[in-house]
Amino acid sequence: MPAPLTLSARAQALQPSLTLAIAAKAKQLRSEGRDICSLSAGEPDFDTPPFIRTAAAAALESGHTRYGPAAGEPELRQAIATKLTLENGVPTSSDQVLVTNGGKQALYNLFQVLLGPGDEVLLPSPYWLSYPELAQLAGATVKLLPSDASAGFRLQAEQLDAAITPASKLLILNSPSNPTGMVLGRADLEAIAVVLRRHPHVAVVCDEIYEFLLAPGHSHHSFAAVAPDLADRIFIVNGFAKGWAMTGWRIGWLAGPRAVVAAASALQSQSTSNVCTFAQYGALAAVKGPRDCVIAMAEQFNQRRTLLSEGLQTIAGVTLLAPQGAFYAFPDVSAYGLDSMALCRRLLEEVGLAVVPGVAFGDDRCIRLSCAASPATIVDGLERLERCLASL
């Protein structure tokens, strides 16, 4: 009898995505006839704008069906570089851009070429759940820098300064934030820059995937534009999923110092190779095209974010710092005495509401609800949440 195959240590340590698991469970229950209301989605519920779909279809029909450069189509890399230069205030050339299979692969590639055993990643908490897993897959250790609503879910400069050690290699910044909706202002970034100037061995990766999704009165600032003197150790990860409603297209990008981006491109050439060729022409149309569709979707999210936030603030025992961007709310529900996983299980089983436990994001006091749903679905979800909490 053959010996059983043994998984590698890194595979055994890997945790599957809880958000995807919850979404799959909700779909399964719905297919079984259960009345399920899901506020767990991390993707826009809009269709990709027609002009983007048309451009991809035209590229397909015109023969863009072969292998392309591993780093991405040259026109798309140049268009992304131009966008970063003109819109974000970060001077970028096309050889500093790598087109990836979504923002997640951009992070994976970067971590694999930059991190290794003995390296430390500084991660503000709450955090997007894939950050620690991706860092650990690269052999690095993760040091959490916790925050909460009383601090606005913001990384404090003095907290960062105290956390940095000789082993610290990379700081992760995510603004607007998943899951909290926090937006780092210019003053926040300037204070972080002051600290990093004292620690030249620490690089920064800025996840800007929600840059277009901002509540009124808030602005997005690219860290490399605020602190251009640090640009030689700042990486930007972004993509088309959230702003252009292109989650299934799987097109993101990594931008930053040439040598590291080149290494990430070499890694990609030995793994997935190029992103789907004709899909890149849809992305090219998106980044070069008018922003009307992006603005219209962002406005819809503003209305839904307000609806969700105001509804949560009326429920007894629920504490919420109103989100400033992205399309999530992250209320504290610890007054009910249940850990977040237990509460989310009861919500799904008893009232058919699918949301994500805060423990997945590093804060067991909270749950994450998405406003990437119709207003009617948001109202339905709020009613189910209030009904379940009232029964506890």
Language model feature labels by segment:
Residues 40-43, 58-77:
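A glycine-/small-polar-enriched, mobile loop at the entrance of the PLP active site in fold-type I
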Residues 1-7, 11-17, 22, 29-36, ...:
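PLP-dependent class I/II
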